[in-house]
A protein has these predicted regions:
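Positively charged n-region of N-terminal signal peptides that target proteins for export
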Residues: 1-4
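Bacterial N-terminal signal peptides
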Residues: 6-15
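Patatin-like phospholipase
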Residues: 20-67, 75-329
Length: 329
């Protein structure tokens, strides 16, 4: 008799639990939210301000896809770093030195020659003809930024156990051998992020098996389609481009040196895919960054770009607040 009574009570408890859950959710299930962070160099600081507003409005993020520095911000966010953590990171880092593989031990020296490479104020500027070719020149190895990313991932909130689970994350790179887009979602996250931001002509490509990978902005700078395939029902996309190029005019007019290449990667991705992707986002956020560019990593500019991002997030506060309610089903 006691045995049957125990089973009966358990069934009642289970039933009440299900009823309570349905009552709390109003019989609706929450859609899966995908976050897309486009590339844009220093301008990606604006995305951090927008992330702050997502957190304030308690918008859950179930999937993340990013390109170039958007992959770095997205990857770290997926590993449990929050917007405040990322803001401190952006404010405290000397990004130009980090990205340029600058040897900080040589900063105080105007001229230094080491292993056949000539440095000015710590920056590699010329390789002698008889120098070891493996030292590289005009092709930054990206060792500093890789080690930096690897250290951040290895001691992330997820790895330390303060955040239970990582958010599923994918980033986009471009295989220069086969001339095609590659989506990276397995293996070393630091390596994947490093591949996604390997600017052609500036950074050494990242080799994974037979793939030779460079910056994903070559093929897909706003990977809305990628996060959809991951399983997102609705997509919030943060686009840092200021030129939309709908008319396809003068496609290579501003390719002038490395600065032009950086601009091209930030402003001239695969045009057809980009124009489709930005219209496929459920919530498309494009902060007005004025004249700030991809290389504006100085402290004053970063502070201003972060503020623009926060102000943009505030402008979208009402939309974000209603977002989940409107999309529940």
């Amino acid at each position: 008799m006691k045995k049957y009574l125990l089973v009966f009570l358990m069934l009642i408890c289970c039933g009440l639990s299900v009823m309570a859950q349905q009552q709390n959710e109003g019989g609706k299930t929450r859609p899966k939210v995908g976050l897309v962070l486009g590339g844009g160099g220093a301008k990606c600081a604006a995305a951090i301000g927008i992330l702050k507003e997502l957190e304030r409005e308690k918008i859950p993020v179930d999937y993340i896809a990013g390109t170039s520095i958007g992959a770095i911000i997205g990857g770290l966010y997926a590993q449990g770093y929050r917007a405040d953590d990322l803001e401190k990171l952006f404010r405290s880092q000397n990004w130009l030195a980090l990205l340029a593989d600058r040897d900080t031990t040589l900063v105080g020296k105007v001229y230094k020659e080491e292993d056949g490479v000539i440095y000015l104020f710590g920056f590699p500027v010329r390789r002698k003809a008889d120098a070891d070719k493996n030292t590289g020149f005009w092709m930054l190895h990206g060792d500093h930024v890789y080690n930096f990313l690897d250290s951040l991932v290895s001691r992330s909130p997820v790895q330390r156990g303060t955040v239970k689970q990582a958010i599923p994350f994918s980033c986009v790179a471009f295989d220069i051998r086969r001339q095609r887009e590659i989506v990276l979602d397995t293996g070393s996250m630091a390596r994947n992020m490093r591949a996604s931001m390997a600017i052609p002509g500036a950074f050494k490509p990242v080799q994974i098996d037979t793939l030779m990978l460079v910056d994903g902005g070559m093929s897909n700078n706003l990977p809305v389609d990628v996060v959809r395939k991951m399983g997102a029902d609705i997509v919030i996309a943060v686009d840092l481009q200021q030129r939309k190029h709908d008319d396809y005019r003068s496609p290579f007019g501003f390719l002038k040196g490395l600065g032009g290449i950086l601009d091209w990667l930030a402003e001239r991705p695969d045009i057809k895919k980009y124009n489709v992707n930005r219209t496929k986002a459920d919530l498309y956020i494009n902060p007005d960054l004025g004249s700030y560019g991809v290389t504006d990593f100085n402290a004053k500019a970063i502070k201003a770009i972060l503020k623009i991002g926060e102000d943009t997030g505030i402008l979208y506060r009402k939309q974000l607040g209603m977002f989940m309610k409107d999309h529940q089903r």
